[in-house]
């Protein structure tokens, strides 16, 4: 087997070649290529004339030797038009019921069926067997069919509770396409002279039959790590608990996991990663409502849980809470405490300064900076006699903010623990302390916990950086995940700086 990174590069180049001349269809081509390389089916939903059939024709060129079959279904389509006409010779000479399948679906590797829901029951029943078992019953014999990719298309969804639901459930990847939107792309499409029948893929990139068969075995060997399974199970539980969530059969879950394995394999990895789970948004929806619902649920999973974002924020909240508890304990120890001297018949308590406050001018530190008189204040200088008078009789108290300028009036009080508290205009308060009494505002316990959390965040970010090179995931998703991780990192850094 080729080196994983070389294989990933080759598949990327193969996809680029297939996308050439198709505008705003890169994601559809890539997912159809992934389906073809893993033997799955695709349903394309969209209005006529948006290159649905061209996408299917292009996929034939991904392989060195691949035959294609395409057919536009109508209400009058017959099995003979899809699976081949009956052999009159065999019926006449030997009495055998046998179809001539050359050039029809049973001998094609790439199959495109347009307006699929217009097919009759006879076609649908045979098609179900072909998709499920990759076998076709031709008269008395079961013949293996080589189909690698079935692309079915329609401009409408099947009716609910109809006989079409069984076939719809077999379409693993479901893509909703629209006409070209970007102005520049629209112009390029109009003036393009590319022949749609030309093969845009160099022979060196095309997949041989031997490679294809070997890759099917290799895909099955890709592991599903426990953390990734837990994410999948979480998503399943979320969907089960939502009233309008689509029903997802066990069969569809199993086939979807194989698609995730294929995504990992063709991205050069030996295990499914959280990034691969984004593909589930194209596998688990049923209609427009469930498509939006799946987008929302996958975004919650990817930006909140896949790289432990929410778990890290929860841990950070616990660390911050613990830090506040320690700071409160430290605040009680270091706060400037006055001595209560209230008399028996006094309506308000009187206070005196403690013995250590003996200087004529006292500088007291704010345990937390406040904005007072339009100034960020970290300490206040008091005249000792003025402070003693205020403690005894109350009234107005003034102090120099940061020790400079004129003494300014202050909103100050003595709390129940006999600590001096100063408040700003919004009544936010902080206690005052003597210089040298305050200790390090970041306890060693908290500092260590924040460092550990930051290291864990770096590991998660590194994991994401290593996994994000996935051809089959749109770059918009990568941007949202990166933003969610950066938000967590920024909150951790802010906590470290406080």
Curated annotation (Swiss-Prot):
Its EC number is 3.6.1.-. Keywords: ATP-binding, Chaperone, Cytoplasm, Hydrolase, Nucleotide-binding. It is found in: Cytoplasm. GO terms for cellular component: cytoplasm. ADP binds at residues 23, 49-54, 196. Coiled coil: none annotated. It comes from the Bacteria. Pfam families: AAA_lid_8 (PF17868), ATPase_RavA_C (PF12592), bpMoxR (PF20030), LARA_dom (PF20265). InterPro entries: AAA+_ATPase, ATPase_RavA, ATPase_RavA_C, MoxR, P-loop_NTPase, RavA-like_AAA_lid, RavA_ATPases, RavA_LARA_dom. Its main location: cytoplasm. GO terms for molecular function: ATP binding; ATP hydrolysis activity. It catalyses: ATP + H2O = ADP + phosphate + H(+). ATPase activity is stimulated by ViaA. Homohexamer. Interacts with ViaA. Component of the RavA-ViaA chaperone complex, which may act on the membrane to optimize the function of some of the respiratory chains. RavA functions as an ATPase. PANTHER family: ATPASE RAVA. Belongs to the RavA family. This is Regulatory ATPase RavA. It comes from Salmonella heidelberg (strain SL476).
